[in-house]
Every structure is written in structure tokens, then in C-alpha cells.
Amino acid sequence: MTLDARIGLRLGSLDLRVELRAHAHEVVALLGPNGAGKSTILRCLAGLEAVGDGRISIDGVVVDDPDADVFAEPEARPIGYVFQDYVLFDHLTVLENIAYGLRARGVAKTEARRRSHDWLERLDLADFAHQRPQVLSGGQAQRVALARALVTNPRLLLLDEPLAALDARTRASVRRDLRDHLASFDGMRLMVTHDPVDAHALADRMIVVEAGRVVQSGTPADVTAHPRTRYVADLVGVNLVTGVVADGVLTTQTGARVVIADAADGPTLATIRPHSVLIGSGDGVASSARNSWRGTIVDIDRL
């Protein structure tokens, strides 16, 4: 299974130009600041937005190509979608919510209910089959939304901030459950998140989008070790310094000089990790640090 997507779209102030590829058994996390285009990418893949230019194919089947006048409606795409706030229908029972996607695809009511009940059993929700979503906890609501997305046997599963609606107390346990459920799904999985912890815990690969462009991609370890933009550095909790290296010294645009190790001459990026910083008072601190600066501490965040 392979997703190949080249998406070009202008939507308000957003100019989206990205290329994505995903494979079976892979969890890809899309990260980026608000307004970067992450959720819009999911909407284009799901058929909720048509691309302005580009091409989307799933397993070699083209579902969106304006040049060829091809556009498959959402219900005709082999996709499951877990929305950020789960979007469960309050007027339907839990069983009817899960069956909704099947019914929209023309599956007979009896068969849709049978398949939906199977998923309720798998996700330990059978006791809630005939209750309304209002009685569900955040974790239970997420499992219902996941069951609704998976009951149609999709090839591609889209998850938009699947843990954002949860409070801090339940987030960790639900994250563990979600990881197990994703591992049992053998299709392609694409997840939007703002949280690097979620990305590290759930994703095999990270794609960072800023201002409608992919600025970095790689494994969580690679992205964390080598942030390429200020946003990525802030995301993974390091300080990013840009400048030009000559003879082992990086000089920034403001004239600050940083001694660095193992870098060729020329423009480069350097990272300073919080655990590498030593703060002292007085005329100096005895250490083996290659760099030292004088300054005034105005605030300290205790993490």
C-alpha cells in the first residue's frame, strides 16, 4: 500500500504546496504551527477539499487530479477519518455512530450493525452500544471515533489531533491504547499533532509543515537531533543558532561567536541543549565549557 500526494491549494491566506508519501504499517506524524496547513492536508486526502493543482493516489488509484478531471467523493475513497473533536452524532447511539460510514457507503443496515458491533467488542465498548455519546468519557469517545473510521476497512487512516480533546490525567493512558490500536491496523496511518510527545510515542516518521511547505522530515530521532528551523528547535526543546563557521567558530548575524565541534566552514545550524547549559554567579564558573557569556537572568521556568 502506498499513498502518493502532491497537493497545491490556495485557501484564504494559506498557500499549500506539499508532497507526501506513506506506506503500509507506517505511522506518519504531521507537525507544524497553527495555520501551517496540516489539517487542510488531511481534508484534501479525505476529499473534503479539492486540490487546486496536484495529484493524489492511493494504491495506484487516482482519487484527485484536476488536470485529468478526476475527483472521488469522500465516501468513494478507501479512507477512515478520526476528527479532532471526534464529531460523534449526539442523536445516534454509539452503535449507530459506528455504522454511519458503512450506511453512507450503501451497506445494508443489518450488515452495518453486525460489523459495527464486532468493533464495539474489539474495543471493549459493547456495554455502550445502545447509549448516546454524551455518557462516554474522553477515552471512550476516541475509541468510538476510531471504530467508526476502521469499520469501513480503509487503506488509509487519518487522525486529526486524536489526543487534543483529552485532559492531562487521561492523555497518557489513552495514548498507550491508541498506540496498540494503530499497531493492529495494517494500512497507512497519517496523524496531525502539535505535541512532540505524541509524535515520539506513536510515529515512525515525522513531517514538519510551516507556512504550507514541508521544512523537514525524518524519524523522530533524526528530527530531534537535527532541527532545521526555529519552530522545530522550539518543538523539541533545544536552542537553534544560525550563522557562518570559520575555523571552528560560528559567528551569528549579531556578531556573537560560538565555538563548535566538527563542523565544516560555511553557513550552518548549531543546537544548544538545555542540559548542556551551566549557570553560575560571580566572576566565573570552573568548567570545561568551550563557550561562556555574561548576562542577567530575568526569569526561570521550573519544568
What are the functions of these language-model segments?
Residues P78-G80, T93-R228:
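ABC ATPase nucleotide-binding domains
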Residues T254-D301:
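Glycine/charge-rich catalytic "coupling/switch" loops of P-loop NTPases
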